[in-house]
């Protein structure tokens, strides 16, 4: 059946260039196809201004609202190191919760409505360890389902004293040698954070250049759940970098002017994060996951769970997706996108797409 004759009541509609594009208001049906939406224009409407967010290109459901502790939870965690080499230690807290009382874990806790994610990690470190800290960089984002997100930060101690008196937040805090953690010499609540410790060691050793903006959550309210795909292809010799963008992005100079240059999807809580990635890969490129690795890192996050009464506690995440070097450049399924070359080293670094550049890791649980 031709695309233009699909029944919008019973089917999700995949609009391509040349067809009328439905408004980005809600999902039209119960199928599993991706709905491709407006790209800056409506019939008779004026093109969007630069630096304004686009209406998302694709849609998989829609959140009526996003509110912390109602339908979404954010967790803030800290990795804090001291010493070097074989003497490197990590700061852990002894859990006070009944389910894991007495076991050791990284400082972490739920973000409360009315505070930023950065404020939350500073508060948790103070309550659980006794130390004041400076939040240096986002190390990792972990996502479970579509309503649970854990932000792990690299932090530095700025003051305070090691906690020794137990309370409801923690029983104590202590420094442990990383080698002892890996050798199972410490009774841990869980071992999932050890890879974050490794990432922190790598970050401290090969941290970002000072002139490059840190990847920290931007304090902007987001009315929904959004995912941006920065699909990057590096040549085998590392001399050429290409990225998939909207056709309105004529060349790399436009990247710096556009708020949202990459393919973007809005999704609802009924779609798990990994499922959204899989569906969008298949929709964007002929070979999908056969030619592009699973998103491995994040390069931008917008999230602001305040004020408390807001219904826009959602999140917008830009993910780094690396095209396989062994594969030919993927055929684009939608005519609204194209590949552009990014030749400027400064632009590559600004967008965190340079090959050896630090990027916070992404783990889909």
Swiss-Prot record:
InterPro entries per UniProt: Nudix_hydrolase, NUDIX_hydrolase-like_dom_sf, NUDIX_hydrolase_CS, NUDIX_hydrolase_dom, NUDT18_NUDIX
Motif Nudix box, residue numbers: 109-130
Gene3D superfamilies: Nucleoside Triphosphate Pyrophosphohydrolase
Keywords: Hydrolase, Magnesium, Manganese, Metal-binding
Named cofactor requirement(s): Mg(2+); Mn(2+)
Annotated binding of Mg(2+), by residue: 124, 128
Tagged with keyword Ion transport: no
Transmembrane spans: none
Residue stretches making up the Nudix hydrolase domain: 72-201
GO MF annotation terms: 8-oxo-dGDP phosphatase activity; 8-oxo-GDP phosphatase activity; metal ion binding
Domain of life: Eukaryota
EC number: 3.6.1.-
One GO CC term, this protein: sarcoplasmic reticulum
Similarity annotation: Belongs to the Nudix hydrolase family.
Protein function: Probably mediates the hydrolysis of some nucleoside diphosphate derivatives.
Name of the molecule in the record: Putative nudix hydrolase 1
Organism: Caenorhabditis elegans
């Amino acid at each position: 059946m031709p695309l233009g004759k699909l029944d919008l009541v019973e089917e999700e509609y995949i609009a391509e260039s040349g067809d009328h594009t439905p408004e980005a208001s809600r999902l039209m049906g119960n199928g599993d196809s991706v709905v491709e939406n407006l790209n800056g224009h409506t019939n008779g409407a004026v093109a969007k201004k630069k630096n304004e967010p686009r209406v998302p290109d694709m849609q998989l459901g829609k959140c009526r609202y996003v509110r912390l502790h109602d339908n979404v939870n954010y967790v803030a965690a800290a990795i804090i190191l001291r010493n070097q080499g074989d003497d490197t230690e990590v700061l852990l807290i002894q859990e006070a919760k009944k389910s894991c009382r007495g076991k050791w874990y990284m400082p972490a806790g739920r973000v409360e409505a009315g505070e930023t994610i950065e404020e939350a990690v500073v508060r948790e470190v103070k309550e659980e360890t006794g130390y004041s800290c400076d939040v240096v960089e986002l190390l990792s984002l972990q996502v479970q389902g579509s309503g649970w997100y854990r932000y792990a930060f690299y932090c530095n101690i700025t003051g305070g004293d090691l906690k020794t008196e137990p309370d409801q937040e923690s029983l104590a805090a202590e420094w442990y040698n990383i080698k002892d953690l890996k050798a199972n010499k410490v009774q841990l609540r869980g071992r999932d954070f050890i890879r974050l410790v490794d990432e922190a060691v790598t970050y401290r050793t090969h941290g970002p250049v000072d002139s490059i903006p840190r990847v920290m959550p931007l304090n902007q309210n987001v009315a929904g759940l959004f995912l941006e795909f920065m699909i990057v292809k590096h040549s085998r010799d590392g001399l050429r970098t290409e990225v998939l963008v909207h056709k309105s992005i004529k060349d790399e100079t436009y990247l710096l002017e556009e708020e949202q240059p990459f393919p973007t999807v809005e999704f609802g809580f009924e779609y798990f994060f990994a499922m959204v990635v899989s569906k969008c890969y298949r929709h964007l490129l002929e070979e999908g996951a056969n030619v592009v690795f699973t998103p491995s890192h994040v390069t931008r996050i917008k999230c602001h769970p305040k004020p408390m009464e807001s219904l826009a506690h959602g999140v917008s995440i830009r993910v780094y997706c690396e095209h396989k070097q062994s594969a030919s450049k993927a055929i684009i399924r939608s005519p609204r996108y194209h590949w552009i070359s990014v030749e400027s080293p400064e632009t590559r670094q600004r967008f965190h797409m340079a090959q050896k550049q630090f990027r916070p890791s992404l783990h889909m649980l």
